[in-house]
């Protein structure tokens, strides 16, 4: 099938990355359609909606490069699959990653299904990742060429069938080249700042936002030996390894969050960046998704990331039970956070990932939840 007979539907956010993605595909001769996904009502307290501005940018870019465009509303799907999950995780005292769930349930499920109804052969997004296609039909996901921008961490839940329908045109180039192309083509988004943070919070204060949906209950802040240090504003506002926002004065090393007791509503803190309570030796993770087959029965060595832009850590992975894996670290790792993703790699190939449930010391002692 020639490029002109291949329809690619591009998820366009109104940012420079998806704009250049659409431009590249159009230049390569594909039949390109731009889709703006409205996942959240971004209207602020003054009645201003950032989604309107973003969609106007999508319209401008699509008109510039000469492709049709549509807006599709996925607010219900986003609420049901992403935001409800986000709140449920915080209720459990965990720190979720809504971007991972958004990619799994919205951008590469609801959006992909919609695109296929439009006759799409592929969907494309402005993610910094790569897809390697093999002659037998199976695919692999690779890190983006720009190590500083690689987004495979957030794509770890994508399946073989999803990836077989996906294109990442800017995964082979660096961010500065994306900007250069946008400026060279005088695209409307060429100078637009990259968006940061969680889309449904935007520029708002995180505590204020979360308190609108979940009641906060203040409680005691204690050391692991039981000494009362202060008062916390609500366990959901804190994450393992957090230093800022604790409100603890005094001399000596800074204080860090080292654990939570949900039953008694206690936040545990200790002094020192390298306090032993912040380190663990292995984790158990569920919601497992592997792009390709791996040998969980015998276990295998690979590297892992436990948060975005973290250096790879050498690990050994094996089955814990039919619903979970055990990831054992070659050396203790600091501040691994339940609710976040553990993402596994073999060189540049992203093998897949899972959601961190519990974190342990070598002795089998549970870390972080006392």
From Swiss-Prot:
Disulfide bonds, paired cysteine numbers: 102-199
Subcellular location: Cytoplasm
Pfam family name, one: tRNA_Me_trans_M
Enzyme class: transferase
BP terms from Gene Ontology: tRNA wobble position uridine thiolation
Source species, domain of life: Bacteria
Interaction with target base in tRNA as annotated region, ranges: 97-99
Residues noted as binding ATP in the record, renumbered to the chain: 11-18, 37, 126
Protein name: tRNA-specific 2-thiouridylase MnmA
Species, as recorded: Staphylococcus saprophyticus subsp. saprophyticus (strain ATCC 15305 / DSM 20229 / NCIMB 8711 / NCTC 7292 / S-41)
Underlying gene: mnmA
């Amino acid at each position: 099938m020639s490029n002109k007979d291949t329809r690619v539907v591009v998820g366009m956010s109104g940012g420079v990355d998806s704009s250049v993605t659409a431009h590249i595909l159009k230049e390569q001769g594909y039949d390109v359609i731009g889709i703006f996904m409205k996942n959240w009502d971004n209207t602020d307290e003054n009645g201003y909606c950032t989604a309107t501005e973003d969609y106007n940018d999508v319209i401008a870019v699509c008109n510039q490069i000469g492709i049709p465009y549509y807006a599709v509303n996925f607010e219900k799907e986003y609420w049901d699959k992403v935001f409800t999950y986000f709140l449920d995780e915080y209720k459990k005292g965990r720190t979720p990653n809504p971007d991972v769930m958004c990619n799994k349930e919205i951008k590469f499920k609801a959006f992909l299904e919609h695109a296929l109804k439009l006759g799409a052969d592929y969907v494309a997004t402005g993610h910094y990742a790569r897809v390697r296609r093999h002659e037998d039909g199976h695919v692999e996901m690779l890190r983006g060429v720009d190590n500083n921008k690689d987004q495979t961490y957030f794509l770890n839940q994508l399946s073989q069938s999803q990836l077989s329908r996906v294109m990442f045109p800017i995964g082979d180039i660096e961010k500065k080249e994306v900007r250069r192309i946008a400026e060279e083509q005088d695209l409307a988004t060429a100078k637009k700042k990259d968006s940061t943070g969680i889309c449904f919070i935007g520029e708002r204060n995180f505590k204020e936002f979360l308190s609108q949906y979940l009641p906060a209950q203040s409680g005691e802040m204690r050391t692991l030996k039981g000494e009362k240090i202060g008062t916390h504003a609500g366990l959901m506002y804190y994450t393992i390894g957090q230093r800022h926002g604790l409100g603890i004065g005094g001399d000596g090393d800074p204080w860090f969050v080292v654990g939570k007791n949900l039953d008694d509503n206690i936040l545990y803190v200790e002094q020192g960046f390298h306090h032993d309570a912040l380190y663990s030796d292995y984790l158990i993770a569920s919601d497992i998704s592997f792009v390709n087959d791996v040998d969980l029965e015998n276990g295998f060595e690979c590297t892992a990331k436990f948060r975005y832009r973290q250096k790879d850590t050498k690990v050994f992975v094996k089955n814990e039970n039919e619903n979970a894996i055990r990831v054992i670290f070659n050396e203790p790792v600091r501040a691994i956070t339940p609710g976040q993703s553990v993402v596994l790699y073999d060189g540049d190939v992203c093998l897949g990932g899972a959601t961190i449930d519990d974190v342990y010391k070598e002795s089998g002692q549970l870390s972080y939840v006392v």
